[in-house]
Curated annotation (Swiss-Prot):
A Gene Ontology molecular function term of the record: arginine-tRNA ligase activity
Disulfides per UniProt: none
Superkingdom as given in the UniProt entry: Bacteria
The keyword Ligase appears for this protein: yes
Protein name per the record: Glycine--tRNA ligase beta subunit
SUPFAM superfamilies: HD-domain/PDEase-like (SSF109604)
Catalytic activity: tRNA(Gly) + glycine + ATP = glycyl-tRNA(Gly) + AMP + diphosphate
Species in which this protein is naturally found: Shigella dysenteriae serotype 1 (strain Sd197)
Coiled-coil spans in chain: none
Gene: glyS
GO CC terms in record: cytosol
Amino acid sequence: MSEKTFLVEIGTEELPPKALRSLAESFAANFTAELDNAGLAHGTVQWFAAPRRLALKVANLAEAQPDREIEKRGPAIAQAFDAEGKPSKAAEGWARGCGITVDQAERLTTDKGEWLLYRAHVKGESTEALLPNMVATSLAKLPIPKLMRWGASDVHFVRPVHTVTLLLGDKVIPATILGIQSDRVIRGHRFMGEPEFAIDNADQYPEILRERGKVIADYEERKAKIKADAEEAARKIGGNADLSESLLEEVASLVEWPVVLTAKFEEKFLAVPSEALVYTMKGDQKYFPVYANDGKLLPNFIFVANIESKDQQQIISGNEKVVRPRLADAEFFFNTDRKKRLEDNLPRLQTVLFQLQLGTLRDKTDRIQALAGWIAEQIGADVNHATRAGLLSKCDLMTNMVFEFTDTQGVMGMHYARHDGEAEDVAVALNEQYQPRFAGDDLPSNPVACALAIADKMDTLAGIFGIGQHPKGDKDPFALRRAALGVLRIIVEKNLNLDLQTLTEEAVRLYGDKLTNANVVDDVIDFMLGRFRAWYQDEGYTVDTIQAVLARRPTRPADFDARMKAVSHFRTLEAAAALAAANKRVSNILAKSDEVLSDRVNASTLKEPEEIKLAMQVVVLRDKLEPYFAEGRYQDALVELAELREPVDAFFDKVMVMVDDKELRINRLTMLEKLRELFLRVADISLLQ
């Protein structure tokens, strides 16, 4: 069967840059699934994406589905005909479904009986006939949150569509896709190359688009070119470009023919904190800042034009003129804000609502101040500095700089605090209170910052849960999942001696009578333990290991982490599987018994050598392991408990627990309870699979 290259290109108006990659990847995945479901043999499915087009190129696509043999078994002969040999209704219905009469059916004979049989040779449908619907279906399944409608048509897509190219080899596949009749005409760059031209064969794509249309359709190629050219441009001026992955992706999605250029701004603007300058360069203008080798911002930036110009200096000057007013605004705001102390913004916090039922930002500040001081006392941080940081924590939200450049919250608080002469750990805490901002982000660097970061997040968790507005489904408007995980990461990775129980109780207490949820403390703790589950699963821990620890509901995060590591190590021991099974057996035996057990094992009642040996070892280990449990040495404790495998196995092999003698039975049940209690000091080992 012959094979050809297939091309589909959807020419549009400018597509959303942040969604371009996902649209193209989904298009390719959807179309590949359509090909596979149709049984069409094919080679590589390559996707292309540029601001005004989505395209797929399929190598070695079969020209038709393979022919196939089908068999449909009908009713058994005994049910297919009546006593007179006439077809039954069941047989006639089956035959109609197959498109034949009962007389035309074959018969299938096996050792189990005889049935009616329909056998047919089905010729594979041509690829040409299948492609239009496959393309339309693939486009309809794209992850587009908001569709557009244009003109007088009722067609919907992410952006208006102007061209549809469907080529199988050199042949146009006739179709109407998204309201546009397919053709071999594609459009080039808006301002360079040929505005539109015909493509003769699918194999010519994307080279013909580059040569005649001045468009680099390959997304990864454009991105790599921007990265390489920007690095070279930065090197030429003795610096390093800030080529963050997210901005690289966005810029690659904004240009069809990237031309990297270098521009500059006045050095006087470097007196403004670099974070504000970088915010406007990256966030507003999509420029790449340039840093010197010592990490200081240089008065230069790199940008990407979408056109080759005979006068590049004109483009450079134009971009310099665009960014200058934004930098001048930042300079003005910075100088204006410093005319008063950060603390002077406190009264204005009373005018901003945190949440209708929970009060203003000033109310939140008072709670954070108190909670940060309480946390600092628990973890051995400077209480005065922590309460001072709490007092100033939201003051920068009232500054001109943060009002205009919102992403500079925190960092501007740090700069203004330094200007006011605040202690360095207080200033740093104002910036780091929002850390970690995302997965993998840095944690607060000093104890005061840790106290403030935990206080801010716990106040939000307690408040929102306290009024019954916990996250539901994918909706989490107050970012409570991120807040909970942030608190856990700080406590675990900084090994802080904090208990979620007392921490949550203190956060709730500071709200006074504002909260309406009577179960708020338990709800917050359960929610945070649930975040633990997600965290450790991401870290590669098995679900049953997590469940074994969660069963004990340890509320000290650092302690929880130690238990997780201990159980994970225990699983590697040879005795683990047998002891997990034994714990499960003990758990079941104890669950079925409703008898009141003794406080201790009565050694004089024990009879069998196996139970005597096990009872002695349980007593010895109980005394030996008490310091281990007190010090959180759970891994060492489980290693010691692993030595119980042989006596436990011997006990269950030789000793009957549920004997008629009540005193003996209760004694044996008590011993098993004491055995299980030792393991439960770490985790519920019976849950391990």
